[in-house]
């Protein structure tokens, strides 16, 4: 692909600066640079199959690079279609904009501009969208949301087997206020072709009140309880039985051994704090174990959103560090969708960790 890229450059940039940028899409950049950002560029509309090495080779042909990063989805590892390049010399950064902005690569026309320094106004602007018509394309979703502001990235989740939309997507706006306006304007509305209203919410915006109650209960429970090895082993087999019920198959002993005795023991006092399994008017609650310390609610949204309607996600955090304690909860409205999520995600490798996923039931958490 590098040869194709360089060939495209030779055929396109000989006549001078590229043409105008596309009107919509991930345009997090400025036309002029500030003193602090004369060397740092953002590159949008990259082909999804472009690799880190190809990205570096393309921009390294302009001048010496201090760093470059092709941004990838944390879950799938796939390129999100944009990246950052930091040059050693401001002149090279300026040359890269004049040379590569508007370059056509495969079906994409890339956009190269100065990266804007981060600020509070542009953070936390990522939206989770569910209930989209299965026929809606990514471009149509962008058109629906672009009336509220500048879109940085967008994505519709597809079924890996069929390639058909799961009706779930993510939209990242340039500014948080734009995301807020999109929620006000589109949440609960029926776009063209939709049978039901869509849900639009922040991808990492769970109920804070419920979260604090959960954290307090878990902290107090873990501080006052201790159980011996026999109790831990019993809890493991309880979980194994639950997994058998969920999948209809017998779990291997290696699966049981991967559960953390400490985490499972700490879970035993959580019944009755709004996360009990079963219908119970609140949906079906799923226990997710072996999350990394850096995991947040957006990870759970992205993992479970493709399988059906998710009403709530919760990552349990350490009081001192605010890091994930290794587990969390997801509530889904439909049993079949919840069971499918469990069957698909239990044993799923997320980074260097293998997730353990099961239904949470009142029996599971008896002392």
UniProtKB/Swiss-Prot annotation:
<dbReference type="InterPro" id="IPR012677">
    <property type="entry name" value="Nucleotide-bd_a/b_plait_sf"/>
</dbReference>
<comment type="similarity">
    <text>Belongs to the RRM elav family.</text>
</comment>
<dbReference type="GO" id="GO:0007399">
    <property type="term" value="P:nervous system development"/>
</dbReference>
<dbReference type="GO" id="GO:0035925">
    <property type="term" value="F:mRNA 3'-UTR AU-rich region binding"/>
</dbReference>
<feature type="domain" description="RRM 2">
    <location>
        <begin position="125"/>
        <end position="205"/>
    </location>
</feature>
<dbReference type="InterPro" id="IPR002343">
    <property type="entry name" value="Hud_Sxl_RNA"/>
</dbReference>
<dbReference type="InterPro" id="IPR035979">
    <property type="entry name" value="RBD_domain_sf"/>
</dbReference>
<feature type="domain" description="RRM 3">
    <location>
        <begin position="284"/>
        <end position="362"/>
    </location>
</feature>
<comment type="function">
    <text>RNA-binding protein that binds to AU-rich element (ARE) sequences of target mRNAs, including VEGF mRNA. May also bind poly-A tracts via RRM 3. May be involved in neuronal differentiation and maintenance. Plays a role in the stabilization of GAP43 mRNA and in spatial learning.</text>
</comment>
<keyword id="KW-0694">RNA-binding</keyword>
<keyword id="KW-0221">Differentiation</keyword>
<keyword id="KW-0217">Developmental protein</keyword>
<protein>
    <recommendedName>
        <fullName>ELAV-like protein 3</fullName>
    </recommendedName>
</protein>
<dbReference type="InterPro" id="IPR003954">
    <property type="entry name" value="RRM_dom_euk"/>
</dbReference>
<feature type="domain" description="RRM 1">
    <location>
        <begin position="39"/>
        <end position="117"/>
    </location>
</feature>
<dbReference type="GO" id="GO:0030154">
    <property type="term" value="P:cell differentiation"/>
</dbReference>
<comment type="subunit">
    <text>Interacts with MAP1B light chain LC1.</text>
</comment>
<dbReference type="InterPro" id="IPR006548">
    <property type="entry name" value="ELAD_HU_SF"/>
</dbReference>
<dbReference type="InterPro" id="IPR000504">
    <property type="entry name" value="RRM_dom"/>
</dbReference>
<dbReference type="InterPro" id="IPR034915">
    <property type="entry name" value="HuC_RRM3"/>
</dbReference>
<keyword id="KW-0677">Repeat</keyword>
<dbReference type="Pfam" id="PF00076">
    <property type="entry name" value="RRM_1"/>
</dbReference>
<dbReference type="GO" id="GO:1990904">
    <property type="term" value="C:ribonucleoprotein complex"/>
</dbReference>
<keyword id="KW-0524">Neurogenesis</keyword>
